[in-house]
Amino acid sequence: MVSNDNPDHDSISKKLARRFISELKKQTHIDEYMYRDIGVNPPQFITQDWIGAVFTAKAKRTAQQQQILAQSDMYIAELAKADVIAISSPMYNYGMPAQLKAWFDQIIRINETFDFDLARGDKPLAPLMSGKTLVIITSSGEFGFEKGGINEAHSHLVPHLRTLSKYLGVDQTFEVASEYQEFADERHTNSMNMAEQKLSAIVSVLSEKKSVNLN
């Protein structure tokens, strides 16, 4: 599971993610569970040296270049093991927090999670992994970010996650959102209840797989 929440408080998206993991553990066998709190331990941002290392043939990389890519290699190895990926994140300024974007930047790497072939025409990029399930758990202070909602035009978190998810090898995606946080009224309570119910339904679907590796 990848969590990107404020480390100073027990955030809503983190609470929902913990509930999801707890229910999934009860209903199915998890072969391996990996948890990464990138709010507490943020990934490194990519640099020109990082890009240079990526585009250097593996056999020709210096010790320094190997060290530069060590974190990326670790994240990719974790991803490769996972059948189910759970990402919990708040919406920051209508989009993805910088730490979560940095995690994707470390993982989406040519010849590791995607390749490039001009023979494919106008869409030369293709993912190298497949068969994974992604559970997106988000929280927001406002509401109506769903398709047709009053804030759909400002929804840049889940659409971004969906765009990038194919490079994680994701074939199936579930979304759970808690909204109205800043309003702190009955609508927020109802939104939380609906999110919890939806997570339980997702667990029921995933439990049919009997055994999973969870990242």
Predicted stretch roles:
Residues 32, 133, 172:
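Residues at the starts of beta-strands that form the adenosine-phosphate
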Residues 38, 139, 178:
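Active-site donor-binding loop signature of nucleotide-sugar glycosyltransferases
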